[in-house]
Amino acid sequence: MHHVYVIECSDGTYYTGYTTDVQRRVAEHNAGDGAKYTRGRTPVTLRHTESFDSKSEAMRREYRIKQLSRAQKEALF
């Protein structure tokens, strides 16, 4: 399975990403091994996930979520 996730950083901002293992990826973010954006904003909290059968579907959804406003992202969860 392919997943898109939204995490909330310690400064209140949101980060959206793609992974095949959500729990591992969130742990990487919290360990400082995730995206550069989240490294100085730990701890992070998982707020939303969506699962897809194909990587291309997940990547399209990730892009769409990244285009949403903060309020629209919050409506997801």
From Swiss-Prot:
InterPro entries: GIY-YIG_endonuc, GIY-YIG_endonuc_sf, UPF0213_domain. Residues 1-75 form the GIY-YIG domain. SUPFAM superfamilies: GIY-YIG endonuclease. Belongs to the UPF0213 family. This is UPF0213 protein VNG_2274C.
